[in-house]
Amino acid sequence: MGSTGEPDRKRRLSSSVAPGGGAPVSPAKRLAVAPTSEDKKLDFTVLKYKNQKLSEQLEAHKFEYRALENKFAGLKEKQRTHNETLSLVNSSWEQLVADLKSRSFCKSGSPNSSPGSGHNNVQKDGTCAPIERDTLRSLVESGATESSGCLPGCHLGSDAPPLHLSTANALGDIFFPSSDLLQANEECALAALTKLPENDRSKQLQSTSSNLLSSLNNVVQALSNLQLKHKQLAEDYQNQRDSSARKRAEHRRLKEELASAASELEETNYKLAALKAQRDNTQGARIPYPTLGNKNMPEDKVRDKQREMQDLEATHKELSELISKRLVEIKRLHEERIEILNKIATFQNILMDFKSIRSSKAFQLVNDRLQKSQAELDHYQTLLEKLQVDKDKFVWQERQFNLKVDLAEIPERVSTYCESSIADLKKDIQKLCDEKNMLILKLEEASREPGRNQVITKFKALVSSIPREMGAMQSEMTKHKEASLELNSLRAEVHSLSRILSRKERDNEEASCRSARAGSDITQLQSVISDLKQTNKELKLFADMYKRESTDSREIMESRDREFLEWAHVHALKSSLDESKLEQRVKAANEAEAITQQRLATAEAEIAESGQKLGTSRKDLVSLSHMLKSKQEECEAYRVEVECIGQAYEDIQAQNQQLLQQIIERDDDNTKIFMEGVKAKQTQDALHLETYSLRRNLQQESSLMDLYNQKIVSLEDQLKMWSDRVGKLQEDGWQQSVSLSNYQRKLVDVHRDAQKLMQSLDGIQANVGSSRLEVADLLIELEKERFSKKRIEDDLEVMSRKASSLRAKARESAVLEKLRHEVKEYRGILKCGICHDRQKEVVITKCYHLFCNQCIQKSLGNRQRRCPSCSLSFGANDVKPIYI
């Protein structure tokens, strides 16, 4: 408060008062005065003035100290309530962490499993996947646990890392398995839904699953919103802590300044008492003064006394006239000051009238633009939400397509099995052809050889076995035909899937066009915001120009400058508030646009990959169709060959019948024995072939059964998990609906409270305007009372002077000489130390030397403004008028 420079000022004053007070005086006007008494009186008056100033500063410091104490008590009360709420929040947070741990134990299966044991985010190839872990760490460190250790008087120290670690572990147990489970459940649900028959129950199950997924997404969004609100509250609390620390530091600084001011005041009081005692001692001694003429002659003394009395009367008249002029001038200045105070009060009321500000054209224009921009932002947000919904639908359909492709692999396996069986049949046919050729050769040899009866019997047995083999081959051919029909159905299904994929590609292109339109709209909104900022800058420039155009007096200019500064501050606050809101909305829109563009890019990449996969699947399908055609042609060729063999067999059978008729009678016994051996051999070979084929078929069927059993078990497990998940989601949805209704009721209450607060704000503003008018009236009355008090004091001083002059006339000559000496001393004090003619009218506040106004104005006109007594530099603001 400027207390450090007071001793220097006292030293300068004590060193500079002597030359100013001891300046030479004209002998024609006044007598010489001792410099020591003048210096002492100047020191006394200056110290008295300083003492008064310091007492005023001390009172102001005391008032500020009381206000700060009240404020500090209020802050302590707020801190106490805040500590209570914070302790409650900490307890609830610990309870939440415990609940999370219990839920994580339930999800992991055993309480001994740690979060890092099952979810360490390490892949099979050794690479880490730290995305979810980083997200969890940011959630725990910045948002959730930020309010758990921010008490001003307590620091957690070593307790904070275990709390963070436990929270991170609990959240890891909740989130990391849930993400894997969600992904696995989605895949299983898609597989189960695609395999369900198309009836009312399956459609109802699909609708309920989609509703549950949407409610789950809403719950996740609500959790993210709660985390953001928690983070904002933690930031607000940190700001309150910083402000309270700053206020405590200011409180300590003001205490120190108050103590220093009190010590300085005591020092000045001590010096003032010493100077008073010294003055009382000096006033008791008489000071001889020279007189004009001869001292020994009494007539000269009488004449001198009369002349001095006349001079005293003349000076008294001059002083009375000067006092009357000064009083008139003071009255005029007082009236001007009252008028200025009235104008300032009216200007303050105009500036703080919020209704007039709201009704202004500029405010209405800015408000309309803000409403338009808000509507456009809402429109763009709806467009972005629609794009997000379309993208989610596309992802869902793409997953369905992938599931259908996976299901299409099963007919491919069946076709490969059919091809392997066809190859086996070809081998069997080839063996039969070879056996046929061998039989023909044996028949020819038997016809040539004498033991043809045995050959004939063998041939009969073979002929009897050929029809059975032909029936088996025909059954296998029918099976192959059925497999070819299934392949045609699979082709039709692949064709339908390709058409669905092309349709989805067209939908994706339309979505990209919509996103491009949304980006152009966002750029237009940004240009509108830049125009608003430019108009705000122009308005500020107009305000500055209007500020510079004023040509009134200095005091009016200062008041207008203060008015314009307050007005600019109000507008700056409003514009900063509006711009911050706009910037937040634009940032949110830009972030949403960037997210949609990223998602669109990923969707396009996935579409390109699916297109490539579809192309490869089409190529594979074409190659398989060509292979099937070739196999069908080979089957037709085999069929023709079998028919040819049958016809040849019929011809041979006719010939054999003729031959048999010739040799039946001779070779009956031999044929019976040979037929029995051939039958036994044929049955043995047939049994071997049947056992081999049955074993091979049994192995293939067992492998297929194992595969289907595994799929059935996995689907049953997934169905159980999904049923449990559906129950949990239904419970969560019910809880969320209850909480949503509660939040809606709270929102309605908040809106009602806001309306009441606005109404109370209008009433308070009206009361503030009336109170300002009352304060202005009180200030005017106070100025009037001060002026009247000053007039009374001046009148009292004049009357005291008159009484002293009357007493001086009635006293003896010694008293008259003493009065004359005192009058001369006062003249020396009142007259200027430069011109020694005019009265002292102004004071330099840096060194407290008194001079007349004209001499000081001359020194102010110079480039180097220095005090004539102590050569201390000063400015125009350091010169203050005084009334003596």
Curated annotation (Swiss-Prot):
InterPro entries recorded: E3_ubiquit_lig_Bre1, Znf_RING, Znf_RING/FYVE/PHD, Znf_RING_CS
Subunit composition and interactions: Interacts with SKIPA. Interacts with HUB2.
Coiled coil: 49-86, 216-541, 580-663, 696-762, 789-827
Top-tier EC class: transferase
Chief location of this protein within or outside the cell: nucleus
Positions of transmembrane segments: none
Stretches with biased composition (Low complexity): 108-121
The record's note on its domains: The RING-type zinc finger domain mediates binding to an E2 ubiquitin-conjugating enzyme.
Keyword Zinc: yes
Enzyme Commission numbers on file: 2.3.2.27
Pathway: Protein modification; protein ubiquitination
Nucleus keyword on record: yes
Protein's UniProt name: E3 ubiquitin-protein ligase BRE1-like 1
Keywords: Chromatin regulator, Coiled coil, Flowering, Metal-binding, Nucleus, Transferase, Ubl conjugation pathway, Zinc, Zinc-finger
Matching SMART domains: RING (SM00184)
Chain intervals for the UniProt region annotation (Disordered): 1-37, 107-127
UniProt function note: E3 ubiquitin-protein ligase that monoubiquitinates H2B to form H2BK143ub1. It thereby plays a central role in histone code and gene regulation. H2B monoubiquitination (H2BK143ub1), mediated by HUB1, modulates transcriptional regulation of anther development, likely by promoting histone H3K4 dimethylation (H3K4me2) in the chromatin of the key tapetum degradation-related genes C4, CP1 and UDT1.
PROSITE patterns on file: ZF_RING_1, ZF_RING_2
Gene Ontology terms: biological process: cell division; chromatin organization; defense response to fungus; flower development; innate immune response; leaf morphogenesis; positive regulation of cell division; protein monoubiquitination
One MF term in the entry's GO annotations: ubiquitin protein ligase activity
Catalytic activity annotation: S-ubiquitinyl-[E2 ubiquitin-conjugating enzyme]-L-cysteine + [acceptor protein]-L-lysine = [E2 ubiquitin-conjugating enzyme]-L-cysteine + N(6)-ubiquitinyl-[acceptor protein]-L-lysine
Zinc finger intervals, RING-type: 832-871
Family designation: Belongs to the BRE1 family.
Disruption phenotype: Semi-dwarf plants, early heading, and partial sterility of spikelets due to defects in the anther developmental program and pollen formation.
Species this protein is from: Oryza sativa subsp. japonica (Rice)
Localization per Swiss-Prot or TrEMBL: Nucleus
